């Protein structure tokens, strides 16, 4: 009995050459619908699926291969005499190769289609054949990825058959694909109906292996969401090397921080912590303000902009060593300047941050929560003195920055410049002292969480702070309010805490 391959693919790249190869090895081909037509038109001797099933395609193509004469041929164990006896009695031909790629649900779910249109891209017959073939991998070669055509061809050329090791790997690829495919469908169907479902289905596809992880002895890779076109899976690399693991984490924060602001803004960042943040009339002004606050820490840093980068800004940036620049666009002459630094990673972003959930792994579990996308609940002035309009503008600026600083976090600012940033401390007074020491001339102070004691207010007064913004909610809020009144400082509560761990 001749060996037989069943080919049914949506993506036809490479399938014609692969089919020709199979035919050259005396393997007959069965196919369906559009694949059958494509192979036939290109001179391949191919059997249409309904010649096997004696049953026509029906329901607008929804039912083509869902038939015992197909699946028995895939699932029969060749060494099982009873299985083979049934096939012989029923005149069922074994299927030795299953070549299937799926309807592009991953792509279509992100397009501007109706719910019903997206549902039509949920593949049923394809996954069923793939799963059957993958289960019976000892006897069936299953190909779900066009990149594996050459792998199979090479083994058949060299060894006359596909090794059990390779068949098992191809089987694993199928179930890996199906878990992502089914996960994407589950998330699509559940939508907002169940915010935290019983089973967490995450669907990500590998973008690339990374040179190493957070440290050189750790291996790493980066995966892209199949459901969402976010900032970090759609950017273009215009210059420089591939991003490292640490680059990915840092760029994410720099881009998010810069995009907190409506006006032109720049965020300079090192080790996942902002070291300079400023707004200005344009990218150049914002960058220079951020740079001048801390020209030491910015060295080797990540720079995020929310506006196009011009030549003047580029000329300033290439004066120092930087790892990455992230912006929505670049003038041509600016790009020419930046490309003089061959290792400088220059990224063009197409999407503003849009994540609604974030996940963190702990040993044996994953924590899932809403992204911290809300800045304030409401502004409530709690002191005798009210902040001026300029102070209020700076207070909101400071709160936008402090969101991105590791807790406990304090930011002091003036005129749209984060003059002092203190964070990552186990009490609140230390980051206050750090921020004030660096932030000479600051007039406002922003805190990511409430004050447990009045000591922060007293320190702020010593440092010349005129207004404070914090979430409120401490049992001793009144002590801090009284301290502000004593020092003539305005203070507002926001109702929202911004811990970052």
From Swiss-Prot:
Q: Give its E.C. classification number.
A: 2.1.2.3, 3.5.4.10
GO molecular function annotations of the record: IMP cyclohydrolase activity; phosphoribosylaminoimidazolecarboxamide formyltransferase activity
Keywords for this entry? Hydrolase, Multifunctional enzyme, Purine biosynthesis, Transferase
Q: Which SUPFAM superfamilies match?
A: Cytidine deaminase-like, Methylglyoxal synthase-like
The protein's matches in InterPro entries, at most eight in alphabetical order, are given as: AICAR_Tfase_dup_dom_sf, Cytidine_deaminase-like, MGS-like_dom, MGS-like_dom_sf, PurH-like
tRNA processing keyword on record: no
Its protein name is Bifunctional purine biosynthesis protein PurH
Q: What is the lineage of its organism?
A: Bacteria, Bacillati, Bacillota, Clostridia, Eubacteriales
Xref: NCBIfam families: PRK00881.1 (NF002049), purH (TIGR00355)
All copies of domain MGS-like, residue ranges: 1-144
Q: Which PANTHER family match?
A: BIFUNCTIONAL PURINE BIOSYNTHESIS PROTEIN ATIC, BIFUNCTIONAL PURINE BIOSYNTHESIS PROTEIN PURH
The pathway it acts in is: Purine metabolism; IMP biosynthesis via de novo pathway; 5-formamido-1-(5-phospho-D-ribosyl)imidazole-4-carboxamide from 5-amino-1-(5-phospho-D-ribosyl)imidazole-4-carboxamide (10-formyl THF route): step 1/1; Purine metabolism; IMP biosynthesis via de novo pathway; IMP from 5-formamido-1-(5-phospho-D-ribosyl)imidazole-4-carboxamide: step 1/1
One annotated GO biological process: 'de novo' IMP biosynthetic process
* Entry text on domains: The IMP cyclohydrolase activity resides in the N-terminal region.
Matching HAMAP family: PurH
Report the sequence similarity comment from the record.
Belongs to the PurH family.
| Originating species | Clostridium botulinum (strain Eklund 17B / Type B)
Q: Which reaction does it catalyse?
A: (6R)-10-formyltetrahydrofolate + 5-amino-1-(5-phospho-beta-D-ribosyl)imidazole-4-carboxamide = 5-formamido-1-(5-phospho-D-ribosyl)imidazole-4-carboxamide + (6S)-5,6,7,8-tetrahydrofolate; IMP + H2O = 5-formamido-1-(5-phospho-D-ribosyl)imidazole-4-carboxamide
The UniProt entry's GO CC annotations, sorted and at most eight, read: cytosol
Q: Record's Pfam families? A: AICARFT_IMPCHas (PF01808), MGS (PF02142)
